[in-house]
Amino acid sequence: MLFLVGLGLSSHEDITVRGLNAVKRCARVYLEHYTSILMTASKEELEGFYGKPVVLADREMVESGCEEILRDADKEDVAFLVVGDPFGATTHTDLVLRAKKQGIVVEVVHNASVMNAVGSCGLQLYNFGQTISMVFFTDSWRPDSWYDKVLENRRIGLHTLVLLDIKVKEQSPENLARGRLIFEPPRYMSISQCCEQLLEVEEKRGQQAYTPDTPCVAISRLGAPTQHMKSGSIHELAEYDAGEPLHSLVILGRQCHELELEYLLEFSEDQERFKDQVHRDQEFFKPAPWVPPPEDED
């Protein structure tokens, strides 16, 4: 059997009882190690907690060499551990499909992820629209397809969760081209860099999906003991040092409820200014007043 086990957001102790029991019965344990990280638990701590070795599964192993993970899973139990919830990435869905095609039984053990824990910032989950990912820009690659999703969300008044890029066990273009197994140090996108890229793309696209004054909430180390929130405009957060990773950002939608705003004010250094930013932003995509159709003179 293949177990996909969610680990939660921060600590080795965030695993559920059901998930821990599944891991302990498995012959092999793999930890997916490229879409996210456990902020307060090392590989060695996990091995001590589970009482067995843990193999780090990088992007290449999961996407290209998944046969190693699925090896003998029809005869013995194998665990594939995922930070957050198992279905937070499409590659995990692909792994399940491959297992089922081989006749391997799959069991999923869910856990908390950024997709639901983001509610701890005070915004109501059913007021969120499409989630986007912000990747590190390079000199030759500055994707902006996510911009249209933000625009759609904002037009219908919904919040946008922005997931920030991480780079773990990545190769430089030169080392990749030369076939050298030399990897770059891990990198984690910061709130400030995300906001700078947001402003750059708005200047390029010019459709006013948002402005420098659009209110947001910056979320640092969600689910960890050092979790921190800060409310402010995109321009203000572009100069904000959010500290250690991991970081996320929420761009507020027009339909910001009074209770949501009251909660967000607790994270603002200048509450009156932030409240004014929210109220002005609510007018930004305000629908035109309804005009009844002309009556038929006949």
From Swiss-Prot:
Residues that coordinate or bind S-adenosyl-L-methionine: L9, D85, G88, S113, V114, L164, L222, H247
Domain of life: Eukaryota
GO CC, alphabetical: cytoplasm
Key words of the record: Cytoplasm, Methyltransferase, S-adenosyl-L-methionine, Transferase
Catalysed reaction equations from the record: 2-[(3S)-amino-3-carboxypropyl]-L-histidyl-[translation elongation factor 2] + 4 S-adenosyl-L-methionine = diphthine methyl ester-[translation elongation factor 2] + 4 S-adenosyl-L-homocysteine + 3 H(+)
GO BP terms: methylation; protein histidyl modification to diphthamide
Enzyme Commission designation: 2.1.1.314
Compartments it resides in: Cytoplasm
Pfam family, one: TP_methylase
Keyword Iron: no
Pathway this chain belongs to: Protein modification; peptidyl-diphthamide biosynthesis
InterPro entries xrefs: 4pyrrol_Mease, 4pyrrol_Methylase_sf, 4pyrrole_Mease_sub1, 4pyrrole_Mease_sub2, Dphthn_synthase
MF-aspect GO terms: diphthine methyl ester synthase activity
Record function comment: S-adenosyl-L-methionine-dependent methyltransferase that catalyzes four methylations of the modified target histidine residue in translation elongation factor 2 (EF-2), to form an intermediate called diphthine methyl ester. The four successive methylation reactions represent the second step of diphthamide biosynthesis.
Stated family: Belongs to the diphthine synthase family.
NCBIfam families, A to Z: dph5
Protein name as it appears in the record: Diphthine methyl ester synthase
UniProt source species: Eremothecium gossypii (strain ATCC 10895 / CBS 109.51 / FGSC 9923 / NRRL Y-1056) (Yeast)
The organism's taxonomic lineage, starting at the top: Eukaryota, Fungi, Dikarya, Ascomycota, Saccharomycotina
